[in-house]
Amino acid sequence: MKLLKRLVSVFAIVLAVGSNAFAGDEVRIVIDEGVDGARPIAVVPFVGSAPEDISKIVADDLRNSGKFNPIAVSQMPQHPTSAAEVNPEAWSNIGIDAIVIGQVVPSGNGYSITYQLIDTVGASGTPGTVLMQNSYTVTNKWLRYGAHTVSDEVFEKLTAIRGAFRTRIAYVVQKNGGSQPYEVRVADYDGYNQFIVNRSAQPIMSPAWSPDGQRLAYVSFENKKSQLVVQDLNSGSRKVVASFQGHNGAPAFSPDGSRLAFASSRDGVLNIYVMGANGGTPTQLTSGAGNNTEPAWSPDGNSILFTSDRSGSPQVYRMDASGGNATAVGGRGSAQISADGKTLVMINGNNNVVKQDLTTGVSEVLSTSFLGESPSLSPNGIMIIYSSTQGLGKVLQLVSADGRFKASLPGSDGQVKFPAWSPYLTK
């Protein structure tokens, strides 16, 4: 048995600043469209009880990816508690080729979580083979994290893609009233364990993660002007890195974390600049007619996507990271490239989230929600979070990159916008 604490050292950093600033009204996933075309799988209810339902969390994670469609407990032909009890034929007869079983039992001041992933059709050689198994000891506080760890391991074993269920999201909440209605918050990717990073009487916009997950850059209108702030999530310390005349916005860390791209109208026209992540003299990358904003780095750091209306209406362009050689990509704005460099996600002219295959140029609409904004990819490129308008307010939406699964994360205490998905927070 290994202690899960060994795995959470980096992840725990993002909890430190929020330890005394817990936000009680969390955003939670509400399913809008299911995953009927995805791979069926069974997550059998784990034996034992704990403050969190481990098997439900695992099933929800797998469903949220769009890759799997966990069957209902009522459809399961048996509830085995160990590999020896599994009847492979009973599962294969209903189209299930893999099942997850496990148990959760008290252990000291926490719980021991044990699971097995079992092949029921013999794809690995023999039906009933244990494909993966593991055991963790966690405190009550880390029970959901323990479940997400199971999900990550099962997902990677079955898809050969690293799981991203132990990542987090940052976003801005504009509360309904109060002296400091604007807040930057961070939560688990599914909306749980939310806490406040910073609150202000003035607007806050566009949080962006550093590639090591230890800092957030965002726009603050404190002192009645737009400033770029970088905040350390371990210590809580904040530093204003850009406070130039005019507007300063849309920060984006370079892939190595050493630089910030941002938009500024310091010279009267909104252009893209780059400077050190701790501030310094900026280098201007764009020029000429039109406004240029929303920079986003390519994974290799060699190019930058941005939004410009230089041609008369907003669309996405791509240029060298040093400036120059700008070419139109399409869409309307808010572009981001997946970590493997193969897929572009952006907002199109109808305010829908679309993905574009950068090899073939083929685009696919993933959302048809009203006024989609600020799409952000999970680090494995499997899920996308964005904001949209519902009624008179803003909410977060989750969609799998294949479009199979759609869900909303409504906030109960205000408008929720500017989501940003963290990088991986574990080694």
Curated annotation (Swiss-Prot):
Keywords: Cell cycle, Cell division, Periplasm, Signal
Signal recorded as keyword: yes
Pfam families recorded: PD40, TolB_N
Compartments (UniProt record): Periplasm
GO BP term (any one): cell division
InterPro entries reported for this sequence: 6-blade_b-propeller_TolB-like, PD40, Tol-Pal_TolB, TolB_N
GO annotations of cellular component type: periplasmic space
Signal peptide annotation: 1-23
Family designation: Belongs to the TolB family.
Cited function: Part of the Tol-Pal system, which plays a role in outer membrane invagination during cell division and is important for maintaining outer membrane integrity.
UniProt subunit comment: The Tol-Pal system is composed of five core proteins: the inner membrane proteins TolA, TolQ and TolR, the periplasmic protein TolB and the outer membrane protein Pal. They form a network linking the inner and outer membranes and the peptidoglycan layer.
UniProt name for this protein: Tol-Pal system protein TolB
Higher taxonomy: Bacteria, Pseudomonadati, Pseudomonadota, Gammaproteobacteria, Pasteurellales
